[in-house]
Amino acid sequence: MKTIFKLMIVAVCALSAAGCCQNKECTCTADKQMAVQLYSARDLIGNPELYAKNHEEVLKAIADMGYTGVEAASYNDGLLYGVTPEEFKADIEAVGMEVISSHISKQLSPEELASGDFTESLAWWDKAITAHKAAGMRYIVCPYMAVPATLKDLKTYCEYYNEIGRRCKAAGMGFGYHNHSHEFQKVEGEVMLDYMIANTDPELVFYQMDVYWVVYGHASPVEYFNKYPGRFKVLHIKDAKEIGQSGMVGFDAIFNNAETAGMAEFIIEVEGCRNEQAIEGLRVSADYIKTSPFVKASY
C-alpha cells in the first residue's frame, strides 16, 4: 500500500511540474505566495501515527506543487501532529515552506459559560500559545463553535475571544475565528457572525473567512468585505472540491476585493477530496491559483 502511495505522489509531482505549463500562452506564476490547510491531507498525515509515517513524502509533494506555507490542524497538549513545535517547524522548513497558522479550539464549559470566569480555559490557551509561538506561528485560529442558545452566551464567547486575542497579541501572534455556514443562523434575531464581528475588538480578533462556507450559507463574501472592511486578515480559499471547479464561488471577485477585506494572506483548503485523492486535489487547486491572473504574487 505504501509503495502505491509513493507512486501516486511521484505522479502528482510530475504533473505539478509540467501540467500547468504545457502551452506557450500559460500565465502560470510559480512563485505566488499560497499556503495550504493541512486538514486537506488529514487521511494521510492527520494524526500523530499517520504524520510519523507519511509526513516526509506528503509535505514534499505539497511543496513541489508550489505551496509556500502551511496551516496546521492537529494540536494536543503542547504537540503538533505528535511532535514538538520545534520539530514541526523544522519538518515544514525542510521542504522549503513556512509555518503560518494553526486551527485549535477550547470550548467553554457550561460552568464557565454561566459564570463568565474563563480561568481554566485560559490556562489551556496559555500553554497552547507558548507551543505555537515556539513553532513560529503568525496566527492561531479557532475553527468552530456551536450556535449558542442566547445572545448572552454569544456575548460571553466574544469576551472570551477578546481575551484569547489579547494573550496572542502579547505573544506576537494574531488570533482569529474561522466561520462555517451555521454562523449565518440567527440568535434571538441577530445573525451570529455579524454579532461576533460587532462584539469583538478588531485589534484583538480577526476573522478567517471561509469563502465556500459563506456562499453555502447563502451570503456574499464581497458584501461582507464591504460591510466589515479590514476584518478578514486571512481568507480560506475553498470550493466544494478542487478550487475553481464548482462554479459556485466567485474567486475573481473575492481576490479583486482582497484589499477591502484586509487580506494579508490566503490559505487553500481542499476538504472534499479524501485519502490519496487529496494530493491530486491540492495539485489542481494550486494550478488554478497559479494560472489565475486575478491572484497576485503576494498580499
Residue ranges of each PLM-predicted region?
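N-terminal pre-domain/capping segments
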Residues: 21-135, 287, 291-299
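Histidine-acidic metal/acid-base catalytic patches
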Residues: 2, 21-65, 190-209, 213-299
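Sec-dependent signal peptide recognition
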Residues: 2-10
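C-terminal motif of bacterial Sec signal peptides marking the signal peptidase cleavage site
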Residues: 16-19
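Short acidic/polar active-site loop segments enriched in Thr and Asp
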Residues: 68, 98, 138-139, 233, ...
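Acidic-and-aromatic substrate-binding clefts and catalytic sites of carbohydrate-active enzymes
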Residues: 42-51, 72-84, 106-122, 146-155, ...
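Active-site acidic/histidine proton-transfer and metal-coordination neighborhood
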Residues: 98, 110-206, 279
